[in-house]
Amino acid sequence: MASIIEKETGHPDERSEIAGVFVRRLQKDMKLQTDPTVIYAIGQQFDGDIRKKDLSIDSPYNTYKVKGLPPTPIAIVGREAIHAALHPKDGKTLYFVAKGDGSHYFSETLAEHNKAVKKYQLK
């Protein structure tokens, strides 16, 4: 979990909130659906852009297809990511999307998340 948190955000203040999202998704038997695991699965062929086709690759690291955590860490982790994994933020958010400035917008519902995706990703 900590390695995914490490790769998901560079904003230290968001780490525990991202950890909380992942914990709630696992508790609800939802897929994590997090891009860093797909990037890890793509490996050396990753060119900096995730495409829709990438989300369907067969890999135990593809959390868009496989429920639960990947079989191994996907990165070396720092102390802050470990702390966030051990102390996830309480809340109701289940989704987040990158805002383009390194931070994320967090949503409680899929409808709210889809609006945020349109706003921040599909410009």
Where are the regions a protein language model picked out?
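Bacterial extracytoplasmic/cell-wall-associated proteins, especially those involved in peptidoglycan
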Residues: 1-123
